[in-house]
Amino acid sequence: MEAAPSRFMFLLFLLTCELAAEVAAEVEKSSDGPGAAQEPTWLTDVPAAMEFIAATEVAVIGFFQDLEIPAVPILHSMVQKFPGVSFGISTDSEVLTHYNITGNTICLFRLVDNEQLNLEDEDIESIDATKLSRFIEINSLHMVTEYNPVTVIGLFNSVIQIHLLLIMNKASPEYEENMHRYQKAAKLFQGKILFILVDSGMKENGKVISFFKLKESQLPALAIYQTLDDEWDTLPTAEVSVEHVQNFCDGFLSGKLLKENRESEGKTPKVEL
């Protein structure tokens, strides 16, 4: 199948026009519950830092040689804005060396693709709350990442080029149970496939559903997509099970693709979404 450059970043193009408003809305979300952490965790040695990173899906750590720079209080201010992210700080020289840090740096660590993303040098010098919020929001990919105009950028920046989408209405009675099984399946493909949730109850996600030629009556459904060559496949499913997800993903990874999708792609003119 011939890849279409105009569709190579199809998810990104679908929602780019809405990005600015969504970013502003997302970064305002915070957790005010009594259990919310108030301060980053101090990481005093390498084992503590390694354990801290390994224990969470997304960790943001400030590696500082100077605690008087503006980036330090800005990092502190992020803790309540992102309750799904673990925050830490370290000034220990051995810790900085272990993570190849040579100056004041804020790093985001992701379990899903084992990535370390750094803000350093000029980025740290010019950092403000809005910039740091955007950096965290874009790059906070979890074992299952909800699709929106912000996370789509991080999804396509990942080294993992195969995306599995569960397209389902979050308001449905079956959502919680299906999501639990979907999350279990995601662990089986860590490092190979990014697992994504698309809420079909949101009007703005309609273009994603139509891209995969799915009808409302076929939902919930799984859709798998390879960013490198635009190949994709779908599997309408009344119930999400670990076995169904595993078989579907294994089939795609082994090169199996529904014949009707290949034929449809060959007949359909390539259009920019």
UniProtKB/Swiss-Prot annotation:
A motif (Prevents secretion from ER) lies at residues 270-273. GO terms for biological process: protein folding; response to endoplasmic reticulum stress; response to unfolded protein. One of its GO terms (cellular component) is endoplasmic reticulum. The keyword Protein transport does not apply. Residues 39-152 form the Thioredoxin domain. Induction: Induced by ER stress. Changing residue 232 to A: Greatly reduces PDIA3 binding in vivo and in vitro. Residues 1-25 form the signal peptide. Keywords: Endoplasmic reticulum, Glycoprotein, Signal, Unfolded protein response. Gene3D superfamilies: Glutaredoxin. It is found in: Endoplasmic reticulum lumen. Glycans are attached at residue 100. Residues 230-233 are annotated as: PDIA3-binding site. Interacts with PDIA3. Belongs to the protein disulfide isomerase family. This is Endoplasmic reticulum resident protein 27. It comes from Homo sapiens (Human).
